[in-house]
Amino acid sequence: GTGTLVLRSYSPTTICIDWKGGGVAVESYTVTNDLTVCEVTTHAGGECAIYAYEEKSPLYVFSTNGIKMKDVDLTNMKSLVLVNLTNSGLTDVKLPDSDDLAELILDKNLLTDIDLSRYASQLRMLSLNNNQLTSFDASNMQNLLSLAIANNQLESLKLANPDMYNLEA
C-alpha cells in the first residue's frame, strides 16, 4: 500500500527513514521550512526508524497517515513540535526526547496504554481517537488545551486541565 508523509524543518536538512527495519529500505528526504509531502510505499509490520545527519536535527514536523508500521522510533528527533502517526497500526511508539513536543496525534492505531508523563507540561494538543485505551489520566497535563480521545474503550478518564477548551471523549 501507500501512505502520506509530511515533513518540515527549521533549516534545510536530510532525513533518512528506514521503512522496514534492519537497514534494508532506507530512503532519504530533503526537508526545508516548506512542507514536504510525499506518497510513500508502505511495508506492513516494518520497524520504522528515523535518522538525521545532525545530532540535533532541525526537523519539527513529522506526520504520517496510512503508513502501516509495527513500531516507530522517534527518540533522536529532539526538535519535533508536531508528531502525527495516524492509521499506522501501532501498538507502541517511541516518542522524541524533546522539550518542544506540543502536538501529538496518534489516531486510528491499536494503543492499549501510553505513558505521556514526560510531556505533561508541554503538550497543548493531544489526539488519541480510535485506539483501544481503557483508561487515561490527563490530570497532570496542566497546559493541555485540546484532548480528543473518542472511540476507545474508556472506563476511566481523569481531567484537571484549567485551560482546556476542547474535549472529544
Language-model-detected regions and their locations in the chain:
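Short intrinsically disordered, low-complexity coil segments enriched in acidic
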Residues: G1-L5, Q142, A150, N166-A169
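Conserved hydrophobic position(s) of the canonical leucine-rich repeat
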Residues: L59, M69, L80, L90, ...
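Consensus "Asn ladder" position of solenoid repeat domains
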Residues: I67, S88, L106-N109, L128-N131, ...
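Canonical leucine-rich repeat
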Residues: K70-V72, V93, I114-L116, F136, ...
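Extracytoplasmic low-complexity repetitive segments enriched in small/polar residues
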Residues: Y29-D34, L59-F62, V83-L85, L104, ...
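N-terminal capping/linker segments that flank leucine-rich repeat
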Residues: G1-L82, G89, D99
